[in-house]
C-alpha cells in the first residue's frame, strides 16, 4: 500500500508547498505498490529552475496511443519543477502528503476517475504533490528505516533525520524535529490492518 502517513496529523496549509511534482521515474505504477512515490516520503528539490516554462506539454504513453496518422495528438501536461526522495545526509524540503500513482488497485488509470484519485490521496504523474514543511504527522512502519522502531533507532523525545529513500531514522539531536510518540498496530477481529506494525508520531520543524 502506497500510504506511509496514518490519519492523525496536524498542520497548517500555509506550511505546505504546492510547487513541485515528483520526478516521473519515481511515480508508482499502482496505488497497491510502495516506494518513493508513496505519501509520507521526505523529498528534496531536484529541479528548481524558475527560468524554464513551469508546465510543459508532450506525448505520454500514459494517455495510450497518441500518434495516430492524420489525427491531432493529445498532449500531457507536466510540471517542470520537481522533487525526488531525499537520502541520508541530505536536506529535505519536507514530506509528501499524497502518493503519486498511475493506476488504482484494479489497474484502472486514475486520470479517468478524479473522485477515486482523491479518495486514494493520490496525484497523477507530472502533477504537483503537496509537501508539508512543518507539523505533526504519524508515520507507518514503511516510512522507517528497517521497517521497525528498533531498526530505525527511534527514541521518544529524541530527534530524527532522513535515511535513504525518504525514510527516517533516529538521532540524539533534534535535526529535523522530534519523535513525540510511538506505538504498534495489529490485525484483529479477523480483519487485516493494512497499517499493522510499528508507527511513530513526529513533530516536523
Regions found by a protein language model. Give the residues of each.
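Surface-exposed, low-hydrophobicity beta-strand/loop segments enriched in small/polar/acidic residues
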Residues: 1-205
Amino acid at each position: 500500500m502506497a500510504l506511509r502517513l496514518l490519519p492523525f496529523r496536524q498542520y497548517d496549509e500555509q506550511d505546505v508547498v504546492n510547487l513541485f511534482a515528483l520526478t516521473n521515474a519515481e511515480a508508482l505504477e499502482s496505488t497497491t505498490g510502495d516506494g518513493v512515490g508513496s505519501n509520507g516520503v521526505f523529498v528534496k528539490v531536484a529541479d528548481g529552475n524558475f527560468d524554464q516554462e513551469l508546465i510543459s506539454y508532450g506525448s505520454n504513453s500514459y494517455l495510450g496511443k497518441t500518434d495516430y496518422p492524420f489525427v491531432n495528438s493529445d498532449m500531457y501536461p507536466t510540471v517542470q519543477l520537481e522533487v525526488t526522495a531525499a537520502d541520508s545526509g541530505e536536506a529535505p524540503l519536507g514530506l509528501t502528503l499524497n502518493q503519486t500513482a498511475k493506476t488504482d488497485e484494479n489497474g484502472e488509470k486514475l486520470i479517468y476517475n478524479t473522485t477515486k484519485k482523491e479518495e486514494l490521496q493520490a496525484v497523477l504523474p507530472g502533477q504537483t504533490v503537496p509537501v508539508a514543511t512543518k507539523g505533526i504527522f504519524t508515520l507507518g512502519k514503511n516510512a522507517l528505516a528497517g521497517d521497525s522502531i528498533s531498526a530505525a533507532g527511534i527514541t521518544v523525545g529524541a530527534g530524527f533525520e532522513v535515511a535513504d529513500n525518504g525514510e527516517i531514522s533516529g538521532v540524539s539531536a533534534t535535526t529535523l524535529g522530534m519523535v513525540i510518540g510511538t506505538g504498534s498496530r495489529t490485525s484483529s477481529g479477523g480483519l487485516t490492518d493494512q497499517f499493522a506494525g510499528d508507527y511513530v508520531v513526529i513533530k516536523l520543524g
